[in-house]
Amino acid sequence: MRVNLNMPTDTTLLLIDDNGDRRSMFKQFLRESGYNIAASVTNPAKLVDATRQHKPDAIVISTDKPSRRLLTEIAELQEAERRPIILFSEDDNPETMQQAVAAGVNAYIVLGLSSNRVRTAVDLAFMNFRQTETLRLKVIEVETALRDRKVIERAKGIIMQQRGIDEAAAYALLRDRAMRRALRIAEVARMINDTNDMLTGVS
């Protein structure tokens, strides 16, 4: 099945492969599919450095078997320079595939090359990456909202105790102060909490 996400023709890829003949074949397939090759790297250990240098839209890795070092590089990359990653390998061991996906690979393809297959793999990786990013950002948004809520609740309690007002009035005071300072309510609440901790000796 061909998955076509109508990727722009200026999409750039970083190619990682220590096999010269296979690397040349990948270059040909990727260019036939309309992708630009930002760079091709022979040493998988240079993955993070090469990504920071060339800033590709996605990364294509081809290897006989993904090494522990390569998987570590992928995990480090996805912490600092998140990109869709497509890994082609001759290793069809399910455990290896699971380790690769856990490290941050978006599409793991057992080698068997053709131009259409390479293009489909890249398209699928972009789709998987976007879905994963959407979920990751939603999780971060929820976690941030929960942290902010706890901060605001504590600040309201401090204001209520110090000023002898009810919860609604305390929140209104927080909101008004945030508006005057062009800050988020949680930021003002955090300032109040920090000041209270300093004055009461809480570390």
Residue ranges: model-predicted function:
Residues 140-203:
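C-terminal output/effector regions of signal-responsive regulators
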Residues 23, 43-48, 57-77, 93:
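Conserved phosphotransfer microenvironments
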Residues 34-43:
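Short hydrophobic/Thr-rich beta-strand motif most characteristic of the beta2 strand and flanking loop
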Residues 95, 113-122:
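C-terminal output helix
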Residues 7-21, 26-30, 59:
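Conserved acidic segment of CheY-like receiver
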Residues 82-92:
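A short, hydrophobic beta-strand element within the central beta-sheet of small alpha/beta folds
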